[in-house]
């Protein structure tokens, strides 16, 4: 197991995080996120980012907007996505990060989705309620990348993840021969010591990988030019968000919210969401399938909101892109997103063999 000496911390945020009073901490982090964003953008854009759709799947409607959305449908539909990010690190090397490379077929081993299959049957769960768009392997091939091109894997959190196929473990060979997992120390300690109320969302044994393939992070990490991982605890204790700067804007990606309107709920056309936010006085509405750290999750969403800024395409909405994007579906009436922003894509993803050319 490794720490991350080659990565820099983002400025301003760590001091604000040390505040113990939740309301004061929120305001300090609101200001600190703006300061950190300014420094982040000044350094210049990322080399490249590509967004790849993996699978559309059902998710309890009561969780998606913390119970605010009014619909007879028991499930919303969400599309899980992977970002392929290439950035130049402090040594001047172009590195490749896969953010949320979900091995989604193995994710069905998590108790929640295993029970869903048992309730509805494999055909309905896999064919009617789900749509497969492509695997991690097929998307990498379409981008001209090989497994050996990948330097790092990271996830916003480890719900539904089985890392063994990617990194080895439990007798399995590693699909990625060089890649190391970047994970917050708090997330790693959580998944190794799950509370009974947390186990429903985790794949049993999914984190049993060789320790030398794991890099533990402590807070906000500046990976390289135009690429960072923000510590955004709350949804899980070690939740983190991808931040990417292009020449025009900053993208932020996580699953703290299920749609960009989660960050501007007064603009939501989904029945119930705007009224819910008005009634409670909330400026963000949580993806609420975990409740142990809701204050932290709310604060983290404000950090994401400040760091991302507003969309250059739809200026009233925050440039937040859910790792699992709320998706229109016939089985989810009145639960379509108000708006879907163009997916994060920028630059030219290059295989390692062409990087020096």
Regions found by a protein language model. Name each.
Residues 104-105, 128-134, 139-141, 145, 175, 194-197, 204-208, 220-221, ...:
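Metallo-beta-lactamase
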Residues 118-179:
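Active-site metal-binding motif and surrounding structural segment of the metallo-beta-lactamase
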Residues 56-139, 241-257:
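Conserved beta-strand hairpin/beta-sheet module of binuclear metal-dependent hydrolase folds
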Residues 42-49, 86-96, 221-229, 248-251:
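Beta-strand-turn-beta hairpins that frame and shape the catalytic cleft
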Residues 157-164, 189, 236-240, 260-262:
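Active-site environment of divalent metal-dependent phosphoester hydrolases
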Residues 98-100, 151-158, 182-184, 231-234, ...:
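Active-site neighborhood of phospho(di)ester-bond hydrolases with catalytic His/Asp-centered motifs
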Residues 1-44, 293-357:
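C-terminal regulatory/interaction regions
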């Amino acid at each position: 197991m490794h720490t991350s000496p080659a990565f820099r911390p983002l400025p301003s945020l760590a001091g604000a995080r040390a505040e113990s009073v939740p309301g004061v901490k929120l305001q300090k982090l609101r200001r600190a996120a703006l300061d950190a964003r300014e420094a982040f953008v000044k350094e210049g854009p990322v080399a490249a980012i590509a967004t790849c759709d993996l699978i559309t799947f059902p998710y309890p409607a009561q969780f998606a907007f913390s119970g605010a959305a009014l619909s007879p449908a028991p499930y919303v539909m969400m599309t899980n996505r992977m970002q392929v990010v290439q950035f130049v690190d402090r040594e001047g090397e172009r590195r490749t990060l896969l953010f949320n490379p979900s091995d989604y077929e193995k994710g069905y081993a998590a108790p929640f989705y295993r029970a869903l299959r048992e309730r509805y049957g494999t055909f309905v769960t896999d064919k009617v309620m789900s749509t497969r768009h492509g695997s991690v392997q097929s998307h990498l091939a379409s981008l001209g990348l090989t497994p050996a091109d990948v330097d790092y894997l990271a996830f916003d959190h480890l719900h539904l993840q089985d890392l063994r196929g990617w990194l080895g473990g439990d007798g399995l060979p590693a699909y990625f021969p060089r890649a190391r997992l970047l994970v917050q120390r708090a997330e790693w300690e959580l998944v190794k010591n799950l509370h009974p109320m947390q186990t429903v969302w985790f794949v049993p044994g999914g984190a049993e990988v060789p320790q030398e393939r794991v890099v533990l992070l402590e807070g906000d990490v500046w990976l390289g030019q135009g690429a960072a991982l923000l510590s955004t605890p709350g949804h899980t204790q070690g939740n983190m968000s991808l931040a990417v700067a292009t020449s025009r804007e900053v993208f932020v990606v996580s699953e703290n919210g299920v749609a960009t309107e989660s960050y501007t709920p007064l603009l939501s056309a989904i029945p119930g969401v705007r009224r819910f936010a008005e009634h409670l006085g909330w400026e963000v509405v949580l993806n609420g399938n975990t409740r142990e750290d809701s204050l932290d999750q709310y604060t983290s969403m404000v950090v994401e909101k400040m760091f991302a800024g507003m969309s250059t395409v739809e200026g009233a909405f925050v440039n937040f892109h859910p790792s699992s994007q709320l998706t229109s579906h016939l089985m989810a009436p009145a639960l379509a997103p108000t708006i879907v922003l163009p997916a994060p894509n920028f630059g030219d993803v290059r295989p390692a063999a062409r990087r020096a050319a």
